[in-house]
Swiss-Prot record:
Keywords: FAD, Flavoprotein, NADP, Oxidoreductase. This is Ferredoxin--NADP reductase. Its cofactor is FAD. It catalyses: 2 reduced [2Fe-2S]-[ferredoxin] + NADP(+) + H(+) = 2 oxidized [2Fe-2S]-[ferredoxin] + NADPH. It comes from Saccharolobus solfataricus (strain ATCC 35092 / DSM 1617 / JCM 11322 / P2) (Sulfolobus solfataricus). The keyword NADP applies. FAD binds at residues 33, 41, 46, 86, 120, 281, 324. Pfam families: Pyr_redox_2. InterPro entries: FAD/NAD-bd_sf, FAD/NAD-binding_dom, Fd--NADP_Rdtase_type_2, Ferredoxin-NADP_redctase_2.
Amino acid sequence: MDEYDIVVIGGGPVGLFGTFYAGLRDMKTLLIDAQDELGGQLVSLYPEKIVYDVGGLAGIQAYELAQRLIEQAKMFGPDIKVNELADMIEKTNDNMWIVKTDKATYKTKTIFIAAGIGKIVPSRLGAKGEIEYENRGVYYTVRRKKDFEGKRVLIVGGGDSAVDWALTLAPVAKSVTLIHRRDQFRAHERSVKELFRVANVYVWHELKEVKGDGNKVTQAIIFDNRTKEEKVLDVDSVIISIGYKGDLGNIPKWGVTMKGRDIVVNGRMETNLPGVYAGGDIVQMEGSPKLALIAVGFAHAAIAISVAKKYVEPNASLFAGHSSEMDKFKPK
């Protein structure tokens, strides 16, 4: 059985930075992620959106940010497992931890849980034809803008993501239509105002059925939820943007103290389990407001790894020093 100083659970920004920082502290590291691609929400939800709230970057495409984080995480040669779900953790008699996944079992001295909202699962409407044409015209996010060039696009939803996708695709699509089941939007006012300028908008409307020729989407049937009157729209793509569900799997059964969906940690990012730490969107820090920001998660990761290093090696310094002064970063 492979043995590690630390196992990082979650391959989003916080887990990736934690993996880098563990390598920086000379810890033998394993990173496990349930998705088939590292990067978390940056890659799976909004790869082409611009992220502005990471220090030192005035604006960077989410996918590019993810690639930089992945490159950084790999600097010290960690083991990385993707498409592998951490299923259970167990304490051993020799004060170690066993991490069981759906594919293997690992032994580690410490664990850093950076699972975000969990495995990302799109919310589905349940409309007729939705599942049949999934990934053949029915989508739940926009991975690449160019896939919708010249297409007649129908977007379902009334939140920031739905409105943002409409604004993003309007310049390249043949047409963009957005339907929302209410007349109030959960999006920025300026964006909603622009939406009505660049797209066809139907409020009080819902999706009833997606139709196609067996290979691709050709039409969508929508209806007014007040009058029940139906309309048939000729479309090439349907984007259902009504949110995502985070599947935490068995994490609530691991024995960590939780508050709702959050793992409770102290200022040292320690859970109630010795040697188990957590950070990022999945935590609620005692006495601190919860801010779902990448920048906050980076700080969580640095603190958690530093405390874990001292747990593994009690004589180690809590502070690693400034990277600009480390020999490992100096030109050879």
